[in-house]
């Protein structure tokens, strides 16, 4: 049989075999049989060496090979579509079947308390503002009337990222920013994370949440401060809560007070309240005139108050939790009580 006739016979054989292919694996086998290293086209190449009209027959073989490759590619696409359709048909979803319920997570108790605190202040007329956790030493200390030698500026109390940048120790940095940004009246509540280089114990942690609220306007008095504190704690605890105000020193307020609430864990004294029956929950006072001046606000015309409170302390009081460390240990047995 001449080479040309042999090629024609192989072409008919290929068509016959291709028609019988019904899977991707069968197609792969057919491809190897014709185009593989030991396939039919390889044998054509060997026979071509013995022919006299190599150019014409070589061109004929190449055209046939291209033809075979094109048909194999077309068949591959057809089989792929068919196999995908079959797979999809087997994976059909019966929408009449009942769905599997997925257990939903819950908000962390501290997030819930934080939102509750902010909502109360918003209802009292405050607007929400935020500031970065990484803050300049100026906004965190200098503009808030901390002297250069104040202990809070030391590395054993504050986390320094470099000589002039710190992890903020309070959300009062919002106050420093807002006073520079706008003129009174200013009535802001500022929630966020704070960081202090402290020993971790039942009462303190290196990472905690704080909310600062401050109000600057004409004729803001100390009575306005005590009134807002009473209104807040009554709304937060949903009951009459006993408050105690103690004179204290904070660089950014004058006069300054610490706010204590009666300890609900024991009512008379435990490790949480150091056996006093009272738990400190906030620091507050009238904004220091120098802080107002640093924010380009005239203290002869305007006055204001500020209060900062720890969210963890509020959660401990509200739910009778005696150890602040429980909030950050990710123990689901503890956290799911509040979901």
From Swiss-Prot:
It comes from Chlamydia pneumoniae. Mg(2+) binds at residue 254. GO terms for cellular component: cytoplasm. Tetramer of two alpha and two beta subunits. Its main location: cytoplasm. Belongs to the class-II aminoacyl-tRNA synthetase family. Phe-tRNA synthetase alpha subunit type 1 subfamily. Binds 2 magnesium ions per tetramer. Its EC number is 6.1.1.20. Its cofactor is Mg(2+). The keyword Phosphoprotein does not apply. This is Phenylalanine--tRNA ligase alpha subunit. GO terms for biological process: phenylalanyl-tRNA aminoacylation. The keyword Protein biosynthesis applies.
């Amino acid at each position: 049989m001449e080479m040309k006739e042999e090629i024609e016979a192989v072409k008919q054989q290929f068509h016959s075999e291709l028609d019988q292919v019904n899977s991707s694996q069968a197609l792969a086998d057919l491809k190897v049989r014709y185009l593989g290293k030991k396939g039919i086209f390889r044998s054509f190449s060997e026979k071509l060496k013995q022919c006299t009209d190599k150019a014409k027959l070589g061109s004929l073989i190449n055209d046939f090979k291209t033809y075979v490759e094109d048909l194999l590619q077309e068949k591959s696409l057809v089989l792929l579509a068919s196999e995908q359709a079959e797979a999809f048909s087997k994976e059909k979803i019966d929408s009449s079947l009942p769905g599997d319920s997925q257990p939903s997570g819950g908000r962390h108790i501290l997030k819930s308390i934080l939102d509750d605190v902010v909502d109360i202040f918003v209802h009292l007329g405050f607007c929400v503002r935020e500031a970065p956790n990484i803050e300049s030493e100026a906004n965190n200390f200098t503009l808030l009337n901390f002297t250069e030698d104040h202990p809070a500026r030391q590395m054993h109390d504050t986390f320094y990222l470099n000589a002039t940048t710190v992890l903020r120790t309070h959300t009062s940095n919002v106050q420093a920013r807002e006073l520079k940004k706008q003129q009174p009246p200013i009535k802001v509540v500022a929630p966020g994370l704070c960081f202090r280089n402290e020993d971790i114990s039942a009462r303190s942690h290196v990472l905690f949440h704080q909310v600062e609220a401050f109000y600057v306007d004409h004729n803001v008095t100390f009575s306005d401060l005590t009134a807002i504190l009473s209104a807040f704690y009554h709304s937060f605890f949903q009951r009459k809560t006993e408050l105690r105000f103690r004179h204290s020193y904070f660089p950014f307020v004058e006069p300054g007070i610490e706010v204590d609430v009666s300890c609900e864990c024991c009512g008379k004294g435990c490790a949480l309240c150091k056996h006093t029956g009272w738990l400190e929950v906030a620091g507050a006072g009238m904004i220091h005139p120098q802080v107002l001046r640093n924010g380009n606000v005239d203290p002869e015309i305007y006055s204001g108050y500020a209060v900062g409170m720890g969210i963890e302390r509020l959660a401990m009081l509200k739910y009778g939790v005696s150890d602040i460390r429980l909030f950050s240990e990710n123990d689901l047995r503890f956290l799911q009580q509040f979901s």
